[in-house]
């Protein structure tokens, strides 16, 4: 056990810190892009509705692993897209990290969009009609009346999406991002006789990340619940 901890201990917190950074950056990007997709999805412009619907349905039904691999092999290795300076000594590490974040954003934003759309469906259509009767256009109505209520109603599904994103960050290891699951794999290879102990350590680590998140968002949902 002491040998295991001597190998694992110094790397454990840095690996989970990478997981946390992946989650935070991806969540921010997914919220922004997901909001854009939602706006397009409910837009009166047919082409925008068609494009957003096609994107959401396509990406939601594509395995996340393929999306991340596409960002790495398709965008970087085939098209030459880089998200870090080549002159940097940490180019490969930074580039793989940012490509993973991009993949998570592209994928998770579709679930954010659907969560927000479910929130929009809870807003009585009469409010939009009343806004239009007062001369407000789609943009003003959506921004000032519909969207704020939709966010409040969608906190629980958005929270579930965030928790799923935290667990999905383990897929970043397929392109060499040094997050928690990559460390777990390396540790198991070096300490196969401690398999269940290693699993337990990393399971507890992810529970520490996700349980407070779920409880906090549940409390927030109760406080901000839309009163019927």
Swiss-Prot record:
Name of the protein in its database record: Glutamate transport system permease protein GluC
Assembly and interaction partners: The complex is composed of two ATP-binding proteins (GluA), two transmembrane proteins (GluC and GluD) and a solute-binding protein (GluB).
Instruction: Name the major location.
Output: membrane
GO MF terms held by the record = transmembrane transporter activity
Please state every residue range assigned to the domain named ABC transmembrane type-1. 16-217
**Where along the sequence do coiled-coil regions lie?**
none
What are the disulfide bonds?
Answer: none
Q: Where in the cell is it found?
A: Cell membrane
**Which UniProt key words apply to this protein?**
Amino-acid transport, Cell membrane, Membrane, Transmembrane, Transmembrane helix, Transport
Gene name of the encoded protein: gluC
Please give the GO cellular component terms listed in this UniProt entry. Answer: ATP-binding cassette (ABC) transporter complex
Which NCBIfam families does the record associate with it? HEQRo_perm_3TM (TIGR01726)
Q: What are the TM regions of this chain, as residue ranges? A: 16-36, 64-84, 100-120, 145-165, 195-215
Q: What is the lineage of its organism?
A: Bacteria, Bacillati, Actinomycetota, Actinomycetes, Mycobacteriales
């Amino acid at each position: 056990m002491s040998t295991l901890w001597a190998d694992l201990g110094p790397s454990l917190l840095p690996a989970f810190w990478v997981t946390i950074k992946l989650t935070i950056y991806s969540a921010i990007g997914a919220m922004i892009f997901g909001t854009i997709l939602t706006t397009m999805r409910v837009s009166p412009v047919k082409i925008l509705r068609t494009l957003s619907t096609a994107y959401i349905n396509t990406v939601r039904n594509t395995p996340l692993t393929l999306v991340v691999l596409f960002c790495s092999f398709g965008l970087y290795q085939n098209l030459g897209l880089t998200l870090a300076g080549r002159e940097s000594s940490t180019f490969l590490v930074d580039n793989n990290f940012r490509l993973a974040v991009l993949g998570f954003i592209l994928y998770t934003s579709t679930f954010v969009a659907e969560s927000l759309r479910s929130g929009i469906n809870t807003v009585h259509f009469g409010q939009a009609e009343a806004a239009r009767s007062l001369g407000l256009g789609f943009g003003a109505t959506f921004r000032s009346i519909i969207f704020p209520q939709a966010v409040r109603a969608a906190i629980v599904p958005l929270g579930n999406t965030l928790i799923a994103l935290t667990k999905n960050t383990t897929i970043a290891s397929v392109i060499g991002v040094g997050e928690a699951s990559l460390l777990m794999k390396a540790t198991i290879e070096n300490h196969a006789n401690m398999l269940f102990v290693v699993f337990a350590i990393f399971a507890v680590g992810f529970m520490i990340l996700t349980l407070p998140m779920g409880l906090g968002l549940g409390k927030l949902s109760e406080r901000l619940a839309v009163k019927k």
